[in-house]
């Protein structure tokens, strides 16, 4: 849970926090996620894809600072993003304030630390964290999971605050006991539209069987290679050579199980220790100064 005002941002756990006084400002981490595996089973009759994915939150992410105010305003630092209803954070805040019957608003500062359109769930996490922060600031009997789903299929996962098996369109969540694991993230500077990624998959009809979740969890604990895959990786990497380069670089750095996260372009690989992760990240950044490289851990 986040510290009181003045401490470093931490993930938000709404179940353990006292309400905030109207005069208080709090800062929260909106954690990134990686998909330790992503199977796309097929296309549903409603036009969505049937997914089977292991999603894990990380200790790196965007930052949100939120305080009560007379009206709703959003400021964004670190990226050229809109600050009105075109921004998912703004829409999430507006949705909660309306559902809770709040007459006032909030001042929100979003500090973008994650690359845009990167497969790390940044926008969805920002939205979920906004919902939980406003629920702390303006407590009300609002169904947060239902509200989150109206904002995006990944948003409910970030309300959960832990690793989960995501099924359906990503909204059917089963918590998983994933150990803390050090890893390295690499984004080669490519933005990938999730819509495009799934369209390319559909063109190839490259649908996949379900993940071996038990085998994946056992391999994580034993620090073995993961029996996993990302169904989107082939179609996306075939069209974006920098993703192929990022995966090869992670493997050459001595890290295990390199994989693209979500629809890309961020790739990751697991390390045996924090020391190995940091050393590999430093080496990769030196070799590829234009890439975004981060050593981190699962939550």
From Swiss-Prot:
It is an enzyme of class 2 (transferase). This is 4-diphosphocytidyl-2-C-methyl-D-erythritol kinase. Pathway: Isoprenoid biosynthesis; isopentenyl diphosphate biosynthesis via DXP pathway; isopentenyl diphosphate from 1-deoxy-D-xylulose 5-phosphate: step 3/6. One of its GO terms (molecular function) is 4-(cytidine 5'-diphospho)-2-C-methyl-D-erythritol kinase activity. Pfam families: GHMP_kinases_C, GHMP_kinases_N. NCBIfam families: ispE (TIGR00154), PRK14608.1 (NF011202). One of its GO terms (biological process) is terpenoid biosynthetic process. The keyword Kinase applies. The active site is at residues 33, 154. SUPFAM superfamilies: GHMP Kinase, C-terminal domain, Ribosomal protein S5 domain 2-like. It comes from the Bacteria. Keywords: ATP-binding, Isoprene biosynthesis, Kinase, Nucleotide-binding, Transferase. It catalyses: 4-CDP-2-C-methyl-D-erythritol + ATP = 4-CDP-2-C-methyl-D-erythritol 2-phosphate + ADP + H(+). Belongs to the GHMP kinase family. IspE subfamily. The keyword DNA repair does not apply. Its EC number is 2.7.1.148. ATP binds at residues 115-125. Catalyzes the phosphorylation of the position 2 hydroxy group of 4-diphosphocytidyl-2C-methyl-D-erythritol.
């Amino acid at each position: 849970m986040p510290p009181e005002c003045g401490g470093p941002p931490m993930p938000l756990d709404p179940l353990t926090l006292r309400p905030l006084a109207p005069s208080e400002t709090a800062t929260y981490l909106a954690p990134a996620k990686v998909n330790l595996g992503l199977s796309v089973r097929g296309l549903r009759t409603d036009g969505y894809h049937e997914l089977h994915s292991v999603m894990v939150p990380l200790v790196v992410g965007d930052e949100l600072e939120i305080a009560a105010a007379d009206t709703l305003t959003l400021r964004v630092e670190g990226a050229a993003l809109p600050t009105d209803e075109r921004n998912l954070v703004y829409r999430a805040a507006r949705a909660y304030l309306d559902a809770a019957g709040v007459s006032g608003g909030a001042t929100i500062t979003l500090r973008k630390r994650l690359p845009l359109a990167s497969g790390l769930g940044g926008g969805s996490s920002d939205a979920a964290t906004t919902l939980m922060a406003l629920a702390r600031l303006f407590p009300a009997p609002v169904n947060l999971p239902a509200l989150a789903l109206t904002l995006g299929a990944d948003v409910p996962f970030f309300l959960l605050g832990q690793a989960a098996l995501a099924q359906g369109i990503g909204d059917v969540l089963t918590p998983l006991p994933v150990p803390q694991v050090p890893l390295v993230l690499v984004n080669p500077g490519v933005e990938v539209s999730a819509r495009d990624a799934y369209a390319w998959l559909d063109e190839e009809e490259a649908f996949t069987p379900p993940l071996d979740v038990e085998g994946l969890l056992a391999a994580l604990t034993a620090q073995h290679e993961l029996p996993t895959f990302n169904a989107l990786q082939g179609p996306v990497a075939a069209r974006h050579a920098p993703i192929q380069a990022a995966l090869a670089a992670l493997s050459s750095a001595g890290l295990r199980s390199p994989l693209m996260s979500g629809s890309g372009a961020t790739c990751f690989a697991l390390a045996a220790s924090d020391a190995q992760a940091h050393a590999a990240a430093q080496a990769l950044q030196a070799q590829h100064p234009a890439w975004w490289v981060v050593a981190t851990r699962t939550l």
